[in-house]
């Protein structure tokens, strides 16, 4: 059996175990996928300064995110259809995150419901909200997150209009999924995945089915979902949601300094510099290239985090050195989930933590809290 050494090894294992339509859903970008690729490539272009003869015998990777102590500044990002990478996927990922000491974020478009995750997780989690046309549903959803004791509300703003993802079109993947004959054949070639799905009752969007009038089956769910993208979404709408939620608010999907300042003005506690993993506007900036200008624009008024392209602990360190106060991972933990369930997510976190710790040591920096652009080669730090 091949040993797992890095996130790429988990990706290869997940690709073998997860049905093609669901694997492709997680592992693809929009249109030509140029932004999807740039997220990774631009991180890899950032080079470190190797330092020697510095005492790094004791190293500390802990940093707070919204006042919550974390083993490392890495949160599990909200990802739709997580429960289709592995049966009960959201529950398993939340458990792994809680045990490891990092935050977990549940997506509106999750398979397991808010209540499911709350009942099985040993720690509070964050809830991610899509602002859809049905504002009554939004209000009820926010109330449910409050009742589940979610410690923060993450509002995603970059999905007013769905970007086109060619692989999803070819696979017949919609919301909910409509498998093609080819994909049905592929499903039966994944026996472990199928057995897992047969063993759970959670196979639909748990936050929606049973919570929206008239949505009782796959057909009515599909009709409702298609009708709910809200191209008219404005900062006034976000302000109203902010008033409803008394806890911490995170605004996700920021790539422009002007939008970052607007998020500060509505009372955000943190913002996530993100291009939705390269799944929305192809040709947009990579997250890491957008990060410095946004950090400069908001200063210390709000925590600035980043997601997109993070596949290693080295990438986490690059983001922190470029000014981020935290990071989120999506695909990296989904690969672990698809490869091995809860244990696979834990393995992904262990890999990233080990890489982060070792790279700090090789850069002569024992404390992550003190990391800045001085650990990068001059050409990279000039961008800060």
Predicted features along the sequence, with ranges:
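Glycine-rich active-site/cofactor-binding loop and its immediate structural neighborhood
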Residues: 70-109
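Alpha/beta catalytic cores of nucleotide-metabolism and tRNA/nucleoside-modifying enzymes
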Residues: 1-44, 289-384
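An N-cap/entry alpha-helix motif that binds or orients negatively charged groups
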Residues: 1-68, 176-233, 369-373, 377-384
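Short beta->alpha linker loops
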Residues: 30-31, 108-112, 133, 255, ...
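A gly/proline- and charged-residue-enriched helix-loop-helix capping module
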Residues: 98-120, 124-138
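Short, basic, glycine/proline-bearing loop/turn elements
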Residues: 75-81, 124-130, 222-224
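Alpha/beta enzyme core
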Residues: 81, 95, 120, 136-306, ...
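Short, conserved beta-strand segments within well-ordered enzyme catalytic domains
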Residues: 47, 62-64, 73-77, 103-107, ...
